[in-house]
C-alpha cells in the first residue's frame, strides 16, 4: 500500500467534521491564485499559506500578501494538527533562501512581512540565524518594510533544565536583536491537550519564551494564537488567555481548527461565530491590546493591521 494512503489512527471521518456554513468561502480569483503561486514557486520558496493549506490564502493572495516559511519544507517536530511535512530528515540549509525571499517580497511590493519557519531542532541555533539573515536581506532592499516573526520555541539540545532555559534565552536574544515589529509564538491549544496536539513542545516552554521576549525587548509586542475545536472547554480557553496575560502577551488570535487530511487529528467541535465573539470580549477585558477572534482567523491573518 502506498505510504500516502496508509491508514493512521485518525483515518475516520466523524459526522462533526462536516463544515458548517460559516466556514465555507470562495477560494478567490484563479488568476490571482496562480499569479502568486507562480511567483513563490519561481523563487523556489515555501509559504505557510500553501504548506499549511490556510483557508484564507485566496484572500491574502488577492491582496498580494503571504507568510514565508523558512528553513525548508520538512519539520523536525510532528505536531498532530500541522500539514507541513515531517517525520523525515530535515533539509540542508539553503544559503540563497534569504535572498530569494527578499527578492519575492520586493516583487510583491509588500509593506508588512510575516516570517515563520519549520522547527529546526537539528541546528545548533535551532534556526534563529535563518530568521535574522532573511530579515537583513529584506531590509537591504527596503529598510521601511515591517517584519513580524512567528517562531518555534527554540527549545532543546540540552538535558539540564537550567541550561535549556539559558540556551532558549540566548537564541531568543539573537532573534530580538534583529528588531522584528512583533514577536509571535503560538501556544496552539490549552494546557491539557498540549501533548496530544503539539508533540515535542510544551505549554510552559512556550510561556517561558513569551515571558523572556517581553523581558528582553519590552518595546516589541508579543503575540500568540490558539486553535479551537480540538476538545477544549471554554473555561480552559479563558484560563489560557489568563496565562498569556500573566506573561504580558499583548496580542492574541483565536481561530477554528480545520483538519488538513485524514492523517491529522480530527475536529472535535466547530465553535460558532458567537463563541468567538464572546471570547474576544473576554480577551479584551483581560487587557490584550489586539484581539483577532473568528472561525477563519489565523495567526498571520491581517497581521499588518492595527
UniProtKB/Swiss-Prot annotation:
<feature type="binding site">
    <location>
        <position position="82"/>
    </location>
    <ligand>
        <name>[4Fe-4S] cluster 2</name>
    </ligand>
</feature>
<dbReference type="InterPro" id="IPR013785">
    <property type="entry name" value="Aldolase_TIM"/>
</dbReference>
<dbReference type="InterPro" id="IPR003698">
    <property type="entry name" value="Lipoyl_synth"/>
</dbReference>
<feature type="binding site">
    <location>
        <position position="300"/>
    </location>
    <ligand>
        <name>[4Fe-4S] cluster 1</name>
    </ligand>
</feature>
<feature type="binding site">
    <location>
        <position position="54"/>
    </location>
    <ligand>
        <name>[4Fe-4S] cluster 1</name>
    </ligand>
</feature>
<dbReference type="GO" id="GO:0051539">
    <property type="term" value="F:4 iron, 4 sulfur cluster binding"/>
</dbReference>
<keyword id="KW-0808">Transferase</keyword>
<feature type="binding site">
    <location>
        <position position="75"/>
    </location>
    <ligand>
        <name>[4Fe-4S] cluster 2</name>
    </ligand>
</feature>
<keyword id="KW-0408">Iron</keyword>
<dbReference type="InterPro" id="IPR007197">
    <property type="entry name" value="rSAM"/>
</dbReference>
<comment type="similarity">
    <text>Belongs to the radical SAM superfamily. Lipoyl synthase family.</text>
</comment>
<keyword id="KW-0963">Cytoplasm</keyword>
<dbReference type="GO" id="GO:0046872">
    <property type="term" value="F:metal ion binding"/>
</dbReference>
<keyword id="KW-0479">Metal-binding</keyword>
<keyword id="KW-0949">S-adenosyl-L-methionine</keyword>
<dbReference type="Pfam" id="PF04055">
    <property type="entry name" value="Radical_SAM"/>
</dbReference>
<protein>
    <recommendedName>
        <fullName>Lipoyl synthase 2</fullName>
        <ecNumber>2.8.1.8</ecNumber>
    </recommendedName>
</protein>
<feature type="binding site">
    <location>
        <position position="79"/>
    </location>
    <ligand>
        <name>[4Fe-4S] cluster 2</name>
    </ligand>
</feature>
<comment type="pathway">
    <text>Protein modification; protein lipoylation via endogenous pathway; protein N(6)-(lipoyl)lysine from octanoyl-[acyl-carrier-protein]: step 2/2.</text>
</comment>
<feature type="binding site">
    <location>
        <position position="49"/>
    </location>
    <ligand>
        <name>[4Fe-4S] cluster 1</name>
    </ligand>
</feature>
<feature type="binding site">
    <location>
        <position position="60"/>
    </location>
    <ligand>
        <name>[4Fe-4S] cluster 1</name>
    </ligand>
</feature>
<keyword id="KW-0411">Iron-sulfur</keyword>
<dbReference type="GO" id="GO:0016992">
    <property type="term" value="F:lipoate synthase activity"/>
</dbReference>
<feature type="domain" description="Radical SAM core">
    <location>
        <begin position="61"/>
        <end position="289"/>
    </location>
</feature>
<keyword id="KW-0004">4Fe-4S</keyword>
<dbReference type="GO" id="GO:0005737">
    <property type="term" value="C:cytoplasm"/>
</dbReference>
<dbReference type="InterPro" id="IPR006638">
    <property type="entry name" value="Elp3/MiaA/NifB-like_rSAM"/>
</dbReference>
Amino acid at each position: 500500500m502506498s505510504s500516502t494512503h496508509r491508514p493512521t489512527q485518525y483515518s475516520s471521518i466523524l459526522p462533526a467534521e462536516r463544515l458548517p456554513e460559516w466556514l465555507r468561502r470562495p477560494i478567490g480569483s484563479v488568476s490571482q491564485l496562480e499569479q502568486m503561486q507562480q511567483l513563490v514557486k519561481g523563487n523556489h520558496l515555501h509559504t505557510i499559506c500553501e504548506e499549511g493549506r490556510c483557508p484564507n490564502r485566496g484572500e491574502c493572495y488577492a491582496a498580494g500578501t503571504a507568510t514565508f516559511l523558512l528553513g525548508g519544507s520538512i519539520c523536525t517536530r510532528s505536531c498532530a494538527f500541522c500539514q507541513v511535512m515531517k517525520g523525515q530528515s530535515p533539509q540542508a540549509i539553503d544559503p540563497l533562501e534569504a535572498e530569494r525571499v527578499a527578492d519575492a517580497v520586493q516583487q510583491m511590493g509588500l509593506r508588512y512581512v510575516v516570517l515563520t519557519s519549520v522547527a529546526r531542532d537539528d541546528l545548533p541555533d535551532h534556526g534563529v540565524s535563518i530568521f535574522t539573515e532573511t530579515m537583513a536581506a529584506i531590509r537591504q532592499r527596503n529598510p521601511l518594510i515591517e517584519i513580524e516573526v512567528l517562531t518555534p520555541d527554540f527549545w532543546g539540545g540540552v538535558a539540564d533544565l537550567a541550561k535549556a532555559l539559558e540556551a532558549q534565552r540566548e537564541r531568543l536574544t539573537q532573534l530580538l536583536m534583529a528588531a522584528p515589529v512583533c514577536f509571535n509564538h503560538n501556544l496552539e491549544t490549552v494546557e491539557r491537550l498540549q501533548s496530544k496536539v503539539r508533540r515535542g513542545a510544551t505549554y510552559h516552554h512556550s510561556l517561558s519564551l513569551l515571558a523572556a521576549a517581553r523581558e528582553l525587548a519590552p518595546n516589541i509586542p508579543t503575540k500568540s494564537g490558539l486553535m479551537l475545536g480540538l476538545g477544549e472547554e471554554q473555561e480552559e480557553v479563558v484560563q489560557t488567555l489568563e496565562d498569556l496575560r500573566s506573561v504580558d502577551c499583548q496580542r492574541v488570535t483565536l481561530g477554528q481548527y480545520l483538519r488538513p487530511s485524514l492523517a491529522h487529528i480530527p475536529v472535535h467541535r466547530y465553535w460558532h461565530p458567537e463563541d468567538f465573539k464572546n471570547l474576544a470580549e473576554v480577551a479584551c477585558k483581560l487587557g490584550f491590546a489586539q484581539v483577532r477572534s473568528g472561525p477563519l482567523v489565523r495567526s498571520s491573518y491581517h497581521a499588518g493591521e492595527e
